[in-house]
From Swiss-Prot:
SUPFAM superfamilies: Diaminopimelate epimerase-like (SSF54506)
Residues holding substrate: N13, N72, G82, N83, N169, N205, E223, R224, G233, T234
Site location (Could be important to modulate the pK values of the two catalytic cysteine residues): H171, E223
InterPro entries from the UniProt entry: DAP_epimerase_AS (IPR018510), DAP_epimerase_DapF (IPR001653)
Origin species: Enterococcus faecalis (strain ATCC 700802 / V583)
Name of the protein: Diaminopimelate epimerase
Gene for this chain: dapF
Enzymatic reactions: (2S,6S)-2,6-diaminopimelate = meso-2,6-diaminopimelate
Amino acid sequence: MNVMMQKVHGSENDFFLLDETQFERSLTAEEIEQLRIQLCSRETGLLAGADGLLLVGEGTHGTSNARMRVINSDGSEASMCGNGLRTVARYLAEKNQEKSFTVETMFADLKVRQAPNLAEEVATYQVEISPVSFEAVTIPMHLGVQTLIDEIVPALSNTIRFTAVAVPNPHLVAFVDHETLNGPEFERIATYVNNENPYFPEGINVSFVEILGKNQLFVRTYERGVGFTSACGTAMCASSLLYTLLKDGVFYEEITVKNTGGMVKTVVHETSDGSYWMELIGNATITHLIEGSLTDLLNGAFEKITITETNEQKHYQEFLQTLSQK
């Protein structure tokens, strides 16, 4: 089978995007696993590897244009990925010539649409992040409490206050100063809760958040199944939600969230029933177009693959330059 694929990123959270509908049959679990191994390795993978695979398939219940699956670089499957969803939204928008539609994910059908570019030649998409839950069973966590909201967890730290929230990916978030953001405690805590431990049996994404000013955040994330990453879309949304609930954020106001890989905008919404959802607005960049046989990709025969580099990363780098000057 011939394969058309894209290398994409949202805030430099990078993926290989593969549309399974181009094939007469869906890929097998074994083929997906082999592609993940061959493509995503940072040491031996294609184009320096990636944080994961984005698989686009037919929707299963007819209300969405397509379904997105997220396979992390370690082989685990994520329930959602905000940065990845933006790139899938762009792919589907250009494929189907639509600007606004919904995409099926593991737990929800999410609204997506094209948005005004963040900068010249930086394609930008806006996606819904929901549902939100603070219940321990949805994380899951075993701390002897039903919710963990702005509390010290002695097993993790005697000084840092944590909140656990699912959006729907599970996140453990702490607001910290600049020194703590970049200090050794972060890696110690993040690696502990993402290895065998009695509190978070499935691991959890961990984010440290520095408040830069009114409606301005910097979020650094250790992503479950990936490790430290340039950015995590759901982490930035979880952080924005908690900034609104616990700090001086305001519903419906745009928040600027900076990260190692760039910048996004978020807006936190409260519905009439008291639930929450977030908008995530950011780049959807295509860096490479890839074509070759499935057999060659499965075997890692990358010398037989045709790779075409776009000029989009150049424009994204120019955008980053403007951020560093602010």
